[in-house]
Amino acid sequence: MQSSLFINFITFFILITIISVSAGPIKCPPINSTASNSTQKRYVVFLSNDKTHYKWLKECYNRTVQSIKTTKIPVDKNSILDISIKGKFYAYSTWYYPEFAKKYLSERPETILVEKDLRVKINQCPKKNESSTNLTVQTNPTFNLDRIDQANFPLNKKYIFPSSAGSNAIVYVVDTGVLVTHKEFEGRASFLGAFCVGCPDTDDNGHGSHVSGIVGGKTFGVAKKVKIVGVKALDSKGQGTNADIINALIFVLIDAMEKKNNAIINLSIGGQRSEALNKVIKLLTDNGIHVVVAAGNEASDACLTSPASELSAITVGATEVKTNDITNFSNFGKCLDIFAPGRNITSVGIQSNTSIATFSGTSQATPHVAGTVALIISKFGNQKPDEMIKTLVKFSTKNLISNTKGSPNNFLRIPPP
């Protein structure tokens, strides 16, 4: 009996020793750089789970964790902005020295992706004309609206659209903000939040308001009854970072999931190809949100940029005013889905609540498609994002555009009334 107890005690002691040794102290590799010229960079980090990662950062480096649900902007470079959605997605953004990110962070077993933050900008040509005007109901629509309700030229000076007009859809415009008080929006526009440091809760650039007017303005909009939500992630120059865009997109996903609305995102921005940004857009479309993105204004392959290269998004190129030619600035290639008017588009300005402005760019082509998605939802009901792409292509005019440079030859056409 004593022998049996002694063996059991020895076995228990060995097990405790093994557990203690295997658990051991948390390893804390040096987080600061020894190089005199090294500076901290912002990174977006994707994880397989967050069970041990945040504990490691807190215990080793005293990093504080904030949730995107309560904090839209990082407090400082020592804070972690957690954008995880439990059971779906685990990620955060913060600042690290490049040596630490590459040598230690990337090698942790739960780390999926470590990407240095990249710059993004609006896809709008710089020249603009803006004036303050008291708008009245126009007898004739702007040329771009006239163009997308018919197969080809000549234009018939009418814009004929379904009477539901996007009424049960919502378009989140992730951009420079929206002048929600502009009369074009008729009280249908609201503001969700700002995600860039030092940015006010309004549009101090004009790009986001202009884009929103094309989506759903009473005079200049494709879907004249759609609800518009402004999400500010770009500054007064129309510039920003992938990390801020990603934070904004995750916040939109949370908002759309809570409200269970028929959500569409208009993303008239572009930058270098980013695996992190593309992954987030795929997360959005996997959760039923339609993401419409600009092809870009570099007159090059859209597959080299993001978000245009994400295949689950609806990528839009731009065409000319009086012809079916691609504009000389529009990106092109197999990553595109459809083309829409993008030259000399008149819409909302920000000088006053009645001002109008004229811009060009794939930024302007994109909201034509976002508005059309709203029309389809209000007329036929919502669809999965991959099915929506097929529906847009079905309604589009085929083989009309000259010199597509490897792009699908689809020109936007709204559904019939």
Predicted regions and their residues:
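Autoinhibitory propeptides
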Residues: I31, K69-N144
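C-terminal subdomain of the subtilisin-like protease fold in secreted/lumenal serine endopeptidases
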Residues: V226-G230, I250, I254-L283, N287-I289, ...
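Subtilisin-like serine protease catalytic core
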Residues: N140, K158-S190, C199-D244, E258-I264, ...
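Acidic glycine-/aspartate-rich tracts in secreted/extracellular proteins
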Residues: D50-T52, P98, R119-V120, G177-V180, ...
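Structural recognition of the beta-strand scaffold that forms the well-ordered cores
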Residues: Y43-V45, S93, I170-V174, G213, ...
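Autoinhibitory N-terminal propeptides
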Residues: F6-I73, D82, E110-C125, Q383, ...
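N-terminal domain-start motif of subtilase-like serine proteases
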Residues: I26-A35, Y96-K103, N129-V173, F195-D203, ...
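Substrate-binding/specificity loop regions of serine endopeptidase catalytic domains
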Residues: G238-I245, L267-D337, N344-A370
